[in-house]
């Protein structure tokens, strides 16, 4: 039963990612940023922490006081607790500043199979990601997030 739910969530996620990419003609930086989000979602689904952390700038800092190493540790704990992960991403807005910086506003539904009583956990969060272009790569320099309906910080 749970496997069926996970397959359904993954299918919905692929559809949403595909539809997100079909928002009309996008600029080259916008296409790169959408690809960056898709790559991050795929790395999370595969529990590839190394790939995710490589997408974060060495100088990352956020309002919660986290640095890159703190985000790495958050990912480590989440990936250890979840046997399987499914993400549903919806990009609401991408703002690009001089092709060298960007802000992405998005909602992410997260589901994971784990050893809890129900065997499944699910949450939905809003994210504001700030990115900077370093050479040809986009790097996350800061982020704010919060559960849907709650204040982001």
Predicted regions and their residues:
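Bacterial N-terminal signal peptides that target proteins for export
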Residues: 1-12
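Hydrophobic core
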Residues: 13-21
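Short, low-complexity N-terminal intrinsically disordered segments enriched in polar/charged residues
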Residues: 20-49, 54-55, 72
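Hydrophobic alpha-helical core bundles mediating ligand binding, dimerization, or RNAP-core interactions
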Residues: 37, 56, 75, 108, ...
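A short gly/proline-enriched turn/hairpin at secondary-structure junctions
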Residues: 55-68
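Surface-exposed, charged secondary-structure patches
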Residues: 77-119
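Short beta-strand edge/turn micro-motifs at domain boundaries
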Residues: 101-103, 121-153
